[in-house]
Regions:
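N-terminal secretory signal peptides and thylakoid transit peptides that target proteins
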Residues: 1-16
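C-terminal segment of N-terminal export signals and the immediately downstream linker at the start
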Residues: 23-49, 63
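Conserved, mostly hydrophobic/aromatic
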Residues: 39, 51, 80, 95, ...
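Acidic (Asp/Glu)-rich catalytic clusters
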Residues: 40-43, 96-103, 134-138, 195-198, ...
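Short, acidic/polar
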Residues: 60-72, 122-135, 187-194, 254-258
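Distinct, well-ordered alpha-helical segments
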Residues: 91-100, 124-133, 155-164, 186-199, ...
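Glycine-enriched alpha-helix->loop->beta-strand junction motifs that scaffold or abut catalytic
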Residues: 196-204, 229-233, 265-267
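Conserved small/polar residues in nucleotide/adenosyl-binding loops
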Residues: 274-279
């Protein structure tokens, strides 16, 4: 069955309300369009679902991207994520253009990836990624800037004097970001190393999936308690296991995926918005 972007957005937001606590549902009835959760140890409140930049690209045009972003915004979504490396910058450009006039009302996140081979693997390279992202997203600051997809020796490299943490701290000092974090898809062990290195991370993005794909169970069993211990906000992803099959074949639903993710207190939002034939 073909599902339109508009209908999936409506279904997802409805499921987000239904998946929330009774108090959240009561607030929704009073006019809050979608439940929110506290961003880790900080006071920011994020909607429990968000728009992902990677799939926003597959709308195919700026006009279609605008439609998705504006519809989600009107429904109350305030979390928008992206990455410097998504589709050679077009994903960030789509989002930046779509958020014109709305920037101050949203929580905007993007990622840098120069330390894993995309461009210049130095502090200067990371700052160039930041300037690129700010330009494309048409903003002078980010709410959250994250090191993209930690693997291999990334934990050790992040703590070097010219590594990712140095870039995050410099960007904070310059007033270009508010918070710093890191992401990962497949290596819970590396997540642990990054966290236990001692830096006070604000957030991490990792798989939280009811279908148990992409080592999500290992992330949930090993990384989630660490995040709770250090009061690190968890942003969930890959709720459908990174594949449209579980959704299109009726193996699970938006409501089930969200209920599962939100069963963890540390999860404050989940990137679970349909913008292509492949909800993730």
């Amino acid at each position: 069955m073909k599902v339109s972007r508009r209908n999936f957005l409506k279904t997802t937001i409805g499921s987000a309300v239904f998946a929330g606590s009774p108090a959240a549902i009561a607030k929704a009835a009073e006019g809050t369009k979608i439940p929110k959760r506290k961003f880790g140890r900080h006071e920011d409140m994020l909607t429990v679902v968000g728009i992902g930049g990677h799939t926003l690209y597959y709308t195919g045009s700026q006009k279609e991207a605008n439609e998705v972003v504006h519809r989600a915004y009107d429904l109350g979504v305030n979390f928008f994520e992206n990455a410097w490396g998504y589709h050679k910058g077009v994903a960030e450009e789509y989002m930046g253009n779509a958020l014109k006039g709305k920037r101050e009302n949203v929580f905007l996140m993007t990622k840098f990836s120069n330390f894993r081979g995309d461009g210049d693997p130095t502090l200067e390279g990371a700052m160039k990624h930041l300037e690129d992202s700010l330009r494309r997203l048409k903003t002078d600051y980010l709410d959250l800037w994250m090191m993209h997809n930690v693997v291999g020796n990334d934990a050790q490299d992040a703590y070097k004097s010219d590594g990712a943490i140095a870039a995050i701290e410099l960007a904070k000092k310059q007033g270009k970001i508010r918070y710093g974090g890191f992401t990962g898809h497949t290596e819970p062990k590396i997540h642990r190393e990054v966290i236990e290195g001692g830096y006070e991370w604000d957030a991490t993005l990792m798989p939280v999936s009811v279908v148990g794909a992409l080592k999500s169970r290992a992330f949930e069993e090993d990384t989630m308690p660490l995040c709770k211990k250090h009061n690190i906000a968890v942003l969930g992803m890959k709720g459908f296991g990174g594949s449209r099959r579980t959704h299109l074949h009726g193996q699970t639903s938006v409501e089930v995926v969200l209920r599962y993710a939100l069963s963890y207190d540390q999860v404050c939002t989940h990137c679970l918005i349909y913008t292509s034939p492949s909800p993730r």
